[in-house]
Amino acid sequence: MTASSSLFSCSMHMEVLTPKISKWPKNFVSCHSKISYVETNYLKSTCYPISRFFCINNLKKTRQRDGIHCFSEGQKFQLDDVVEAQQFDRDILNAIFEVARDMEKIERNSPESQILKGYLMATLFYEPSTRTRLSFESAMRRLGGEVLTTENAREFSSAAKGETLEDTIRTVEGYSDLIVLRHFESGAARRAATIAGIPIVNAGDGPGQHPSQALLDVYTIEREIGKLDGIKVGLVGDLANGRTVRSLTYLLAKYKDVKIYFVSPEVVKMKDDIKDYLTSKGVDWEESSDLVEVASECDVVYQTRIQKERFGERLDLYEKARGKFIVNQNILNAMQRHAVIMHPLPRLDEITVDVDADPRAAYFRQAKYGLYIRMALLKLLLVGW
């Protein structure tokens, strides 16, 4: 028996319903006796076309009436989009990390390397990127999928003619199965996810968030330090404009007995909303201007660049902030032997090149871990667990 619609291609073999498009209006919960929907805080604010819900709801009712279970337990990924770090809980994080470890073991030309064959990912980048764009494209291709890419959508797409983000998303979703979006405006990914009928992955939205970077950062810490509970992390550099440190802070707050140090020039201090969030979650945090002392206490020194592009015409403030906190041999000498230095990259002069040779310099390994995290995300969003 086979059921189909404009949204789904449903096969009753093995009692599994395989969505052609994996984005659903509500999270799916499967059990042995019934299938039900649950709303999440993130999804409650999202509006979906009634026709999509009607189709899905009727499929659900049909399958329940026939006594057939459409999803094997745990097959459907809990999230429809990856927009912000607050979407993840510890169970989801642990499960994603398990999938990422599996991704590390995939061999070329193996059956596992073709699990996304027939799927097409669009990378829509309105801001420059090297690692994020290339790692997502590499992740897709390493799993057998294909890629549509635009490197500078702000200049070389219809956005230059005045097309809205919403119209662009509605158009591009007709060509692809998933969109990886980087945009210069905070909240752009949420806007895209609200109107898209396919998964949206936030690859950075202005000074807002960068959730896939935070996932790979936490994965890196686990791989390098061996634990996440009880760690001390020093966040250094541009904490006001750095979307990576915002997303990372949200994820670190999910672990026990974590302490976070904020080390930054006055003009780019961590914003109050993040500090208030940590306080509300009972996370210990401290602001400091002594990088040597913080480095001596921390398991992770997470350095970031001062983001010149966020200063506009106030280049005097940029020059005032730049170069104030540098990771060099003096910082290495203060650090513990097990500790690591991380950086989301690109690096300017905030980590001296001679640090690269020290085994505690983890930033290039961090970039490699990002490939496996993004392979895991693509696999989960498109085909499930």
Curated annotation (Swiss-Prot):
EC number: 2.1.3.2
Top-level taxon of origin: Eukaryota
GO cellular component, one term: chloroplast
Positions annotated to bind L-aspartate: K161, R243, R305
GO BP, one annotated term: 'de novo' pyrimidine nucleobase biosynthetic process
UniProt catalytic activity: carbamoyl phosphate + L-aspartate = N-carbamoyl-L-aspartate + phosphate + H(+)
Pathway in which this enzyme or protein is active: Pyrimidine metabolism; UMP biosynthesis via de novo pathway; (S)-dihydroorotate from bicarbonate: step 2/3
UniProt keyword terms in alphabetical order: Allosteric enzyme, Chloroplast, Plastid, Pyrimidine biosynthesis, Transferase, Transit peptide
Chief site of localization: plastid
Transit peptide: 1-30
Cysteine pairs bridged by disulfides in the record: none
Subunit structure: Homotrimer.
Name this protein carries in UniProt: Aspartate carbamoyltransferase 2, chloroplastic
Lineage, uppermost ranks: Eukaryota, Viridiplantae, Streptophyta, Embryophyta, Tracheophyta
